[in-house]
Each structure stands twice: as structure tokens, then as C-alpha cells.
């Protein structure tokens, strides 16, 4: 089976977060990761893409990537309702990671 060339969703008139959600629904986690990473590279302020990428890292059990991205996003998300969930999930992936321990206090 040959690899299809990646064409960014925006170039096809498609919302990248929506496309990644479809990939996640069908357990195509690596494809969702590819879409979201490309989106964030080109749209660094796309917060929904960042949050969905965190979820994708969780599904891939990629604790290092999850921790790095959560650390990067802490300043933007710490006062939002999503942050408590991000830390809860983070503790399940990396219970020893200090960032997620701080949120318990």
C-alpha cells in the first residue's frame, strides 16, 4: 500500500480540527496528529487545534509529547475550565510530572 501525499485541510476547504476529529473517531490517531501539527505550525493561535492535539497524544499514549505541549499551553489555558481536565488526563499519563501535581493543590 502506498502512502498518499498529505494535502492540508485548509487547501481543500475543510476545517482541520473537524477533519482531525473524524480521524480520531476512526482511530487514525497518527493521521490526526499529522493534521493537527501542520495546522498548529501554520496557525499557532488555533487553540482548539492545540487542545485536540493534547487529546491525540493521550490516545497515542505519548506522555512526553503530552507533557511538552501542556507545559507550552499552561499560560494560555491555566485559567480556563479545560485546564483541570488537561491536568487530570496528564496525571494518568505522567503521574510524576510536576505540572500536573501542582494543579492538585
Language-model features: locations:
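Intrinsically disordered, low-complexity, charge-biased linker/tail regions
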Residues: 1-31, 38-42, 64, 69-105
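Conserved short loop/turn motifs at secondary-structure junctions
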Residues: 55-57
Amino acid at each position: 500500500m502506498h502512502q498518499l501525499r498529505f494535502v492540508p485541510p485548509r487547501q481543500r476547504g475543510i476545517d482541520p480540527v473537524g477533519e482531525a476529529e473524524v480521524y480520531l473517531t476512526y482511530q487514525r490517531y497518527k493521521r490526526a496528529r499529522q493534521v493537527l501539527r501542520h495546522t498548529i505550525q501554520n496557525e499557532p493561535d488555533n487553540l482548539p487545534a492545540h487542545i485536540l492535539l493534547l487529546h491525540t497524544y493521550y490516545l497515542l499514549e505519548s506522555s512526553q509529547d503530552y507533557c511538552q505541549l501542556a507545559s507550552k499551553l499552561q499560560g494560555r489555558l491555566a485559567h480556563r475550565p479545560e485546564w483541570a481536565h488537561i491536568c487530570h488526563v496528564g496525571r494518568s499519563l505522567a503521574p510524576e510530572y510536576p505540572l500536573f501535581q501542582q494543579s492538585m493543590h
